[in-house]
Amino acid sequence: MHLGTESSISPNNWEWMARPTAPAVGNMPFQINQTVQEAPCVPLLSHSDVASYIETIVNPKSTARPRFDCPAINVRRYQHLQPHPKFFEKTKFHYMFALDLRDEGVELLPRLLASVIEAMRFLGPSYCALSLVGGGGTPDGVYDVLQALRPKIEGMGAKYYLRHPAIYPGTEGEDRIMNLARLRNLVLAPLTNPSPQDSGRYTTETTIIFINDVAICTEDILELVHQRKVQDADMTCAMDYIFEGTFYDIWVSRTLAGDTFFRVPHNGSWEFSGQLLPNSSDALSRERFDARRPFQVFACWNGAVAFHAAPLFRTAIRPGISWSSDVADPRHKADPVRFRRNMEQDGECYMGEPTLFAKDLWYRGFGKIAAVPSVALSYTMSDGEKIKKVKGFVSDVVGDKGPELDETPIPERISWQLTPPKEVLCARTWQTQKWVPWDQSLHETSEKN
């Protein structure tokens, strides 16, 4: 989850990532799809600048805008992801690409969106939908490019959704996590609350590919989807880095033992960031990480994820609540999963919305969540290129292997643990770290209802 810019980051200046925000109003973290006002749209880029971005995004050979090169698609490995017309209706969306960009980096678009478009072309545009939310950050012309991209996407035969909401996560006095959750839910709204013309086009078999503002290659996207499918995972996550190799999403991600991916002492220092997965309880995860094998976690996001839509389609047993409802209560297992903030009045730990999303998945029995170390991402074009040199591209890790899982020397197949850890580390701030029951507030409240 990208919460800042490179210039504002230093290894000892990360307390802001876990700082408390304004107290939540009320106790309804699940009413988050309410009507959203669109932000004013003032063009920031010239027509020629927009044209150069579009040219670079849709034309793989274009050099109109700078970007690093990515490997060609390993067709043999990923061909099984292409829906076969004999078995899949063309009226159904098999893939939904969900991007929450928030105007944080127009310079990323020639790499990010070019990779998304190449993935859609490979998977079959008619089976794909692209939903974007642009706006809410420092304006630099992202929305100008996204608007101009519409005819290109629709011309491919894919569905295109674009919103520019007046939701600003950094607004003083507002709950940051609540606003981030609202943005993520807005990206998913075409699926969770479809228009009449799209009703029935999304199914429990739809795979959602949710990408933050990262420098990503097409093979990164396809590998996440591939691992989700071959591992029978509920969700797969990338690994994101800064400083040419420091793991980034420390506040959000939790290991299968419920701990952070590296130790952050109470003073907030990142002095132990070089010691990833250090605990004996995470020894298997560390072994698999070192071997660049996917490993199971309690929670992750790390810049990009792939998850199946089934948890979003849960059919509620309570009157008036359906899978497409704007109201989803995390305490009711029959309700669909949505991004949310913590239930403050019930004493639930203040966590990032992706952590709570994973927690709610576990609560509903969707705990097969894995991080995929072969997919290494970063948040600027230059850092993205650097991290590929340090960690390698996906193809550097998997070679020319096909879709079959490699069983030597360490099995690629995950042996899934179906029970969550008893406790998870809560870090509202690094100074106030404590261990809490993994289902805190959910379990207690569910007994009362």
Regions found by a protein language model. Give the residues of each.
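Active-site donor/metal-binding and catalytic loop motifs
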Residues: 9-12, 364-388, 400-401
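Active-site-proximal specificity loops/subdomain of glycosyltransferases
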Residues: 130-206, 211
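A Trp-anchored, charged/polar loop motif used as the substrate-binding/catalytic surface
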Residues: 72-82, 184-193, 278-293
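Phosphate/oxyanion-binding active-site loops and adjacent basic polyanion-contact surfaces
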Residues: 102-112, 138-142, 175-184, 349-353
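N-proximal low-complexity "stem/linker" segments adjacent to membrane-targeting elements
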Residues: 1-118
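Short, acidic, metal-binding catalytic loop of nucleotide-sugar glycosyltransferases
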Residues: 114-127, 152
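Catalytic donor-sugar/metal-binding loop of nucleotide-sugar-dependent glycosyltransferases
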Residues: 294-296, 303-305, 309-314, 318-323, ...
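Conserved catalytic core of nucleotide-sugar-dependent glycosyltransferases
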Residues: 214-328, 401-421, 425-441
